[in-house]
């Protein structure tokens, strides 16, 4: 063994065989392997082994070759019993550097604290030593702060002192949680004042700098303090008294969850003004179908029951991310309790901004349809449990946007416990829901506050259905939707791939059906756009799901060649599919990027036969602008990322629908035309889907 002062031990690293520096995450390992493991867990990395054939997944991991294949190195870490739960996901902020002008204040404070500490320690018995020590240190710190006068000089503090609470946040959270003052609402949106703000109001000193009276968009109330602190992961902190504070204030002064330049208000307003109007029949149907729940909520809800609870979003827990604006689970009693253990925050997860709006009435609906409805209403979009899968979906949370085509009147208004009567889910106790038939027309305008109306289209793009979360969760956890054996492409059979592709097609159609801006178009335009873009949507879902897999052996097998034509055009398309999957694996788009790419592919104004082209073009432009801003802010060092993402879309369109149908769906649907299947799936009621 080495000497006491020597960190290196004679025990070898269990991963690479190098000299270990002690126990890390449960095993003896070197600093290199322990650091690699920590980074991989922190960033939720998914590596792919570049080896082929029998060598795939068997790369040597030793001192010399440990950096050559990260996938095999991470696998070796897990095989060596490294414990990922031992990785600390959160650390406190580093101590801020004191400004030179405040150095003498700090010096006097430290001297006073030391004197008080020694005085307190000398006047207590030994059996009370620990309690007295802590109390004396606390009082000494308070006395030192008062003596030094630091609390009278907030204006003189350096930035590192004022903002040290959020010093450990990553770049994307800083961007998404520091919005400017709210911009004026776009024309065509009907806004009303929302309900009272939950929790104690923060003092003026903690209001966002964007303007007086505007609370920080993601501030939460610390259990032991009266002021608001930034939420590290968008989570909810419950104080000992049992009151939980939501992420953002629901009052009229709440700030936007995204910077105003991300939202492109003019485009939203212009697109909204071009959308078709709402018929009186649809308005009457929606009002009549929702009047009872609204009245019930108004009579039974208390101020404490209107809190919106969000679990901490992250890619590692991506079921509860991306569109926490998303749906209520159709099988709430079967929902997974995923907890809130995420280490990283993405731009797309920092979007919740709930609002409590009054009931709808026929006279209060704006002629121009809005793209969102308020989260305070008891209306909830019904998430279908598709018949092709035994999978369950986890509980989602209070949403900003509710797809009117899949609304249901949630039974949470009549819960036995009387808490959260407007269906505020918690990750530990999902509540069952009862589906009801949708209204005749889904393009329904409703009231919303400034934040929800401005950011509505962005959040609608990010996953109105649970499709995006399910695929991304499968990519990272590989346990929810698809069989565990699919992790190894060598064990992936053709039958498994056929079953999986059928699920992916179903999820793509459900994503379209739950996209509210799409529902505002005419029925003819909806069917035309879906028929034109279904293969792009399916291929994007397939590419995202196959990120950790390699389908090359299956696509090049003789079994596949028998199912497609052997002409030159088909063979070229087969190669194009493999190239798309490979490029997708290299870029690894996040959930927001995939959602925007799907919207760009769906809203294709060049589609022949459209009744109204301009709204479609506006929605496509909006999706492109959101994608551009997201890439620029989320990946500032990847200047070519936006272009590479857009260049994937033309490649998708070069593949004929007949090739996709013959390759992936011939044995599943038989001789049924894909156009008829898509129409049936699209017009299927939620109650039929859940059977």
Swiss-Prot record:
Instruction: Give compartment(s).
Output: Nucleus
Q: Name one GO cellular component term.
A: nucleus
The positions making up the signal sequence are: none
Q: Zinc finger (NR C4-type) locations? A: 13-33, 49-72
DNA-binding region(s), chain positions: 10-89
Q: Where is this region: AF-2?
A: 674-685
Q: Does the keyword Cytoplasm apply?
A: no
Q: Which UniProt keywords apply?
A: DNA-binding, Metal-binding, Nucleus, Receptor, Transcription, Transcription regulation, Zinc, Zinc-finger
Task: Give start-end positions of Pro residues composition bias.
Answer: 432-441
> What tissue expression does the UniProt record report for this protein?
In larvae, pupae and adults, expressed in small subsets of cells in the anterior region of the brain. In pharate adult brains, expressed in around 20 large neurons located close to the antennal lobe and lateral protocerebral neurophils. Also expressed in a small cluster of cells located just below the chemosensory region of the antennal lobe and near the mechanosensory region of the antennal lobe and subesophageal neuropils.
Q: Which GO terms describe its molecular function?
A: DNA-binding transcription factor activity; DNA-binding transcription repressor activity, RNA polymerase II-specific; nuclear receptor activity; nuclear steroid receptor activity; RNA polymerase II cis-regulatory region sequence-specific DNA binding; zinc ion binding
Name the source's superkingdom. Eukaryota
Q: Where is this region: Disordered?
A: 85-151, 176-253, 295-450
Q: Where is this region: Repressive Function 2 (RF2), important for transcriptional repression?
A: 172-265
| Skewed-composition ranges (Basic residues) | 94-109, 120-133
Q: Where is the segment annotated Impairs binding to DNA?
A: 103-162, 172-488
Residue ranges of every copy of the NR LBD domain listed in the record: 452-685
GO biological process annotations for this chain's record?
cell differentiation; copulation; courtship behavior; egg-laying behavior; male courtship behavior; mating behavior; mating behavior, sex discrimination; regulation of female receptivity
> Which spans does this entry mark as compositional bias, Polar residues?
363-396
> Where are the compositionally biased (Low complexity) regions?
110-119, 134-149, 214-245, 295-327, 352-361, 406-431
Which PANTHER family does this UniProt record tie to the protein? NUCLEAR HORMONE RECEPTOR (PTHR24083)
What family is this? Belongs to the nuclear hormone receptor family. NR2 subfamily.
Task: Name the job this protein performs.
Answer: Orphan receptor that binds DNA as a monomer to hormone response elements (HRE) containing an extended core motif half-site sequence 5'-AAGTCA-3'. Acts as a transcriptional repressor. In both females and males, functions downstream of tra2 to regulate the development and function of certain sex-specific abdominal neurons, and likely regulates the development and/or function of the nervous system that controls courtship behaviors involved in the recognition and response of adults to appropriate sexual partners.
Q: What is this protein called?
A: Protein dissatisfaction
Q: Which organism is it from?
A: Drosophila melanogaster
């Amino acid at each position: 063994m080495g000497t006491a002062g020597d960190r290196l031990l004679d025990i070898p690293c269990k991963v690479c065989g190098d000299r270990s520096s002690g126990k890390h995450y449960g095993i003896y390992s070197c600093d290199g392997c322990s650091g690699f493991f920590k980074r991989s867990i922190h960033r939720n990395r998914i590596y792919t082994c570049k080896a082929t054939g029998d060598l795939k997944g068997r790369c040597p991991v030793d001192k010399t070759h440990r950096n050559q294949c990260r996938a095999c190195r991470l696998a070796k870490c897990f095989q060596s019993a490294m414990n990922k739960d031992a990785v600390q996901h959160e650390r406190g902020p580093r101590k801020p550097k004191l400004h030179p002008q405040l150095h003498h204040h700090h010096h006097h404070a430290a001297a006073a604290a030391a004197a008080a500490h020694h005085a307190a320690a000398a006047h207590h018995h030994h059996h009370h030593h620990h309690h007295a020590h802590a109390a004396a240190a606390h009082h000494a710190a308070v006395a030192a702060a008062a003596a030094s006068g630091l609390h009278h000089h907030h204006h003189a503090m350096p930035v590192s002192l004022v903002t040290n609470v959020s010093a450990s946040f990553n770049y994307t959270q800083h961007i998404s949680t520091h919005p400017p003052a709210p911009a004026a609402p776009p024309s065509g949106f009907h806004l009303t004042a929302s309900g009272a703000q939950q929790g104690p109001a923060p003092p003026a000193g903690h209001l966002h700098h964007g303007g007086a009276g505007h609370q920080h968009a993601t501030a939460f109330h610390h259990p032991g303090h009266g002021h608001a602190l930034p939420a590290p992961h968008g989570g909810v902190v419950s104080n000992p008294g049992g009151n939980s504070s939501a992420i953002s204030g629901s009052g009229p002064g709440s700030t936007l969850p995204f910077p105003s330049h991300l939202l492109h208000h003019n485009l939203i307003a212009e697109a909204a003004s071009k959308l078709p109007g709402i018929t009186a029949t649809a308005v009457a149907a929606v009002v009549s179908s929702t009047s009872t729940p609204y009245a019930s909520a108004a009579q039974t809800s208390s101020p404490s029951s209107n809190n919106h609870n969000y679990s901490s979003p992250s890619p590692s827990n991506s079921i509860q991310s991306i569109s926490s604006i998303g749906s209520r689970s159709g099988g709430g009693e079967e929902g997974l309790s995923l907890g809130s253990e995420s280490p990283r925050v993405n731009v797309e997860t920092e979007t919740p901004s709930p609002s409590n709006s009054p009931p709808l009435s026929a006279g209060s609906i704006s002629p121009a349809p809005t793209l969102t409805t308020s989260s305070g209403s008891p209306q909830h979009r019904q998430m279908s449990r598709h018949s092709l899968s035994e999978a369950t979906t986890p509980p989602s949370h209070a949403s900003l946007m509710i797809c009117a085509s899949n609304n249901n009147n949630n039974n949470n208004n009549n819960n036995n416990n009387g808490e959260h009567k407007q269906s505020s889910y918690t990750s530990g106790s999902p509540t069952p829901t009862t589906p009801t038939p949708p209204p005749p027309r889904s393009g329904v305008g409703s009231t919303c506050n400034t934040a929800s109306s401005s950011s509505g289209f962005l959040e609608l793009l990010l996953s109105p259905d649970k499709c995006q979360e399910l695929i991304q969760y499968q990519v990272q956890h590989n346990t929810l939707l698809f069989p565990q054996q699919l992790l190894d492409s060598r064990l992936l059979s053709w039958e498994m791939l056929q079953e999986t592709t059928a699920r992916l097609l179903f999820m793509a159609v459900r994503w379209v059906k739950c996209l509210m801006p799409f529902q505002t178009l005419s029925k003819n335009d909806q069917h035309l756009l879906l028929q034109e873009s279904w293969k792009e949507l399916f291929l994007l879902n397939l590419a995202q799901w196959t990120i950790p897999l390699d389908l090359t052996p299956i696509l090049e097998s003789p079994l596949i060649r028998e199912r497609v034509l052997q002409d030159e055009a088909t063979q070229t398309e087969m190669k194009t599919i493999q190239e798309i999957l490979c490029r997708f694996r290299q870029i690894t788009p996040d959930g927001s990027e995939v959602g925007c790419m799907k919207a760009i592919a769906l809203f294709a104004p060049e589609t022949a036969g459209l009744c109204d082209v301009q709204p479609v073009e506006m929605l496509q432009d909006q999706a492109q602008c959101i994608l551009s801003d997201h890439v620029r802010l989320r990946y500032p060092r990847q200047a070519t990322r936006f272009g590479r993402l857009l260049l994937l879309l033309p490649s998708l369109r070069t593949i004929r629908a007949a090739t996709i149908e013959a390759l992936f769906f011939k044995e599943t649907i038989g001789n049924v035309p894909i156009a008829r299947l898509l129409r049936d799936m699209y017009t299927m009621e939620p109650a039929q889907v859940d059977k």
